[in-house]
Amino acid sequence: DPQQRKTVMDLVKDVCPERIYPVGRLDRNTTGVLLLTNDGDLASKLTHPKFLKKKVYHVHLDKNLTSHDMDQIREGITLDDGEIKADAIEYADDRDKSQVGIEIHSGKNRIVRRIFESLGYRVTKLDRVQFAGLTKKNLRRGDWRFLTEKEVDMLRMGAFE
């Protein structure tokens, strides 16, 4: 980090002797699932859009998302770098329309924030709850764990979405 701020790599710097690096990215203001690996082929398979690895986010907005805007996101919206549409989008809580769950497979930088910003919303909180079938279940913010052998095998076989 050019500003010498703590990064996720600081949390795992002494974990293993191999060089590890993040698969994809989360910006500073986003929490959630981030996979680290020393396997470049696996990283490529998980990040390239042609492999359609899904990412699911819980999004908090500064105001209620209208059903019209939700439909637009489903059908596709045009951003500076092309069209994007959600694979799925729903209200996270029917009583609070400012929270949505969105599933995408694009790896474009800040894509979730840019989708909502293009429609006049501000993302106040963004949490990636799933990546390629992996969740953060039972992990607190800042905690990490090694993948099980079964999870690694499933990722290598492409069995996770």
For each feature predicted by the language model, list its residue ranges:
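Basic, flexible Lys/Arg- and Gly-enriched helix-loop patches that mediate nucleic-acid binding at interfaces
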Residues: 1-161
